[in-house]
Amino acid sequence: MAAASPSVFLLMVNGQVESAQFPEYDDLYCKYCFVYGQDWAPTAGLEEGISQIASKSQDVRQALVWNFPIDVTFKSTNPYGWPQIVLSVYGPDVFGNDVVRGYGAVHVPFSPGRHKRTIPMFVPESTSTLQKFTSWFMGRRPEYTDPKVVAQGEGREVTRVRSQGFVTLLFNVVTKDMKKLGYDTGPVDTQGVLSPSLPQGNPQ
């Protein structure tokens, strides 16, 4: 008797929020969460997390190193709404209040294998000089009530933002049953081994 064809595919993601570059700031920590479409559902692992506080390295890079692990598995019936990871970085201001130092988002890589991504971060800005001074004095900087809005397009065009810092992520991606459902994610099979019959590109 033939085995039934799969009705869903799996996307397994692990890796780490590796490090960050914020030249103007120190003693920062990072929160992450995943945003995905309505046809997706997590089946294992953690959808969100918060790292330890990291201080800048003493070498010339002055990197903030978290090496904070990511491990989650999703199932879906179609690729629409492919998961994105949203990052929020926080740290103290001159008054000791935790304020946002950067938001950023990136899609989980589509092809299986090992991937490295550097995400440019940004912060919302007050629209006037008076608002900037008031928010600085009160210790309440502009921030999103829900960081997941970073991964969505609605309303982003009317938000004033300023670029600030970078965060580096490492992903190890494995997919299962995507080809059986008719989706081709590239020359890497479900075990993460390059297929010898296809040309091998440079690793991302």
Curated annotation (Swiss-Prot):
**Subunit composition and interactions:** Part of the tectonic-like complex (also named B9 complex).
Similarity annotation = Belongs to the B9D family.
One BP term from GO: regulation of protein localization
Does the keyword Protein biosynthesis belong to this entry? no
- Please name the Pfam families in this protein's record: B9-C2
- Tell me, in a sentence or two, what this protein's role is: Component of the tectonic-like complex, a complex localized at the transition zone of primary cilia and acting as a barrier that prevents diffusion of transmembrane proteins between the cilia and plasma membranes. Required for ciliogenesis and sonic hedgehog/SHH signaling.
Q: Name one GO molecular function term.
A: hedgehog receptor activity
Cysteine pairs forming cystine bridges in this chain are none
Q: Which UniProt keywords apply?
A: Cell projection, Cilium biogenesis/degradation, Cytoplasm, Cytoskeleton
Can you name the source organism? Rattus norvegicus
A cellular component term (GO) from this record? Answer: membrane
Where does the UniProt annotation locate this protein?
Cytoplasm, Cytoskeleton, Cilium basal body
**Domain C2 B9-type: from-to ranges:** 9-127
Protein name according to UniProt:
B9 domain-containing protein 1
